[in-house]
């Protein structure tokens, strides 16, 4: 564990971390057992607004989870909507694996197409 990760863990103790992904929530509970992970729904801009304005998150059963102190969201989604400046830290795949198939590209070509196969071999 790097020193920076240990500092992050201490700072997150007792905080509420919001995420919309079940996979991320599971990783967060393992990484930061002293933090409370809450289901945080909505489009990316909506979630950022709820974070900034400390708006309590409504639960499907009608209750409230309170407001979040931090959010874990996909960096590519924030970049796509022009909000990359909101990213304070990128979590490495060593800490939190991306979703299965995320950033995966597959290419098919006929087995007999040697020129295409040679070109594809350079990027494999």
Q: Across the structure, where does each feature detected by a protein language model lie?
A:
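Small-molecule-sensing regulatory modules
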Residues: 30, 34-124
